[in-house]
Curated annotation (Swiss-Prot):
HAMAP family named among the record's database cross-references: Arg_succ_lyase
Signal peptide: none
Stored SUPFAM superfamilies: L-aspartase-like
GO process annotations (BP): arginine biosynthetic process via ornithine; L-arginine biosynthetic process
Molecular function, one GO term: argininosuccinate lyase activity
Protein's name according to its UniProt entry: Argininosuccinate lyase
Catalysed reactions listed for this entry: 2-(N(omega)-L-arginino)succinate = fumarate + L-arginine
EC number(s) recorded for this UniProt protein: 4.3.2.1
A cellular component annotation (GO) from this entry: cytosol
Organism encoding this protein: Synechococcus elongatus (strain ATCC 33912 / PCC 7942 / FACHB-805) (Anacystis nidulans R2)
Amino acid sequence: MTQAAAPQPWSDRFETALHPAIVVFNASIGFDLALIEYDLTGSQAHAQMLAEQDIISREEGEAIVAGLEQIRSEYRTGQFQPGLDAEDVHFAVERRLTELLGDVGKKLHTARSRNDQVGTDTRLYLRDRVDHIRQQLRDYQRVLLSQAEQHLETLIPGYTHLQRAQPLSLAHHLHAYLEMAERDWERLGDLRKRLNTSPLGAGALAGTTFPIDRQRTAALLGFERIYANSLDAVSDRDSLVEFLAAASLIMVHLSRLAEEVILWASEEFRFVRLSDRCATGSSIMPQKKNPDVPELVRGKTGRVFGHLQALLVVLKGLPLAYNKDLQEDKEGLFDAVQTVESCLEAMTILFAEGLSFQPDRLAAAVEADFSNATDVADYLAARGVPFREAYNLVGRVVRTCLEQGKLLKDLSLAEWQALHPQFEADIYTAIAPQQVVAARNSLGGTGFEQVRSALASVRQRLEATC
């Protein structure tokens, strides 16, 4: 569908109007309208600075600021709904301001280009979204921490290669995801420091001849510093790439946990039970309860990866300074933000009220395997037997047990002592699952005291940053 072309600020340079199909092709208003609140805020700061610097009169500055506030109100109430002929959010706002104020509205763009304008808008937007996502990460961590604190002494099989390896405290397993989320929170905090740099005043690429005060607009908008180079200011998309990379890692961590929930909820595992609040059924199989939430989180992860790769490809061959290619930086960014926010919310709800762990099933799983085999080798090594010799002996024992349909706990003391004279009656205590977990009390290990201390540290961090 095409739309009739309307005059643009640059129309006097051209003899004929833009082709209607190219109007649609060029337009970004369909998605960059998401920046309108930030565009209005940035424009108000710019107008205030222009008036303070006597580039426009005080009365004109006040009229522009008030006009922009009226546009904000009109947008929020649905009265201002620009079409594709506006091309982008910046022209849409300027056109409406001119309708309201006449020639005074045309003065807003003095000493400014859309190039530094869009950079400012995007940073203001992303700064807010980063703050929101960091708060979401804290909410997610609180829910995981609550689950971990409830299951400090609940055991779960630990896996390598998706094969039973060693038993763990369930709290220790969840703590691993708490630490991943902490790195995500810190990573976004680091990004925010670099994000908080103002490009406003850089102009199209070379600065401006007007006596503007870039530090003033930066202060009005809450930026901590300004770009030192005007070319860099309008060309830089590092912060968007950094955000998409950080968002990708958040999604990696959510997706890994989602995958585990999917496995745990299966009949083959039955480690968790999904509540009706966070599961759906089948249109044909009445017995089904499907883990849609973690499956969607797992599926949505790829789209965030794609947005990161797409932006890197857009940027890799661009000469300085602004190029129309950079219009392609926004749709992926907006979608990645929405995806991360929705997935964090969904996973928080899932762990708050959407699943329950099944301690009896978990305990039975831990009891019915050879994940205590390493502890038999450690038992002998602690009594002077070289570890590799002990390791090989236990490997033979496991093979024999498998052939006979036994577990290690089923061997009699006589059978143990026939294997090696160092075995005594306390071998049964050493290989009991609770003791196996408790004994791994090295710093950062799954031992109950270590996990209790680790969770206390997490709670302290969360309370300090609430």
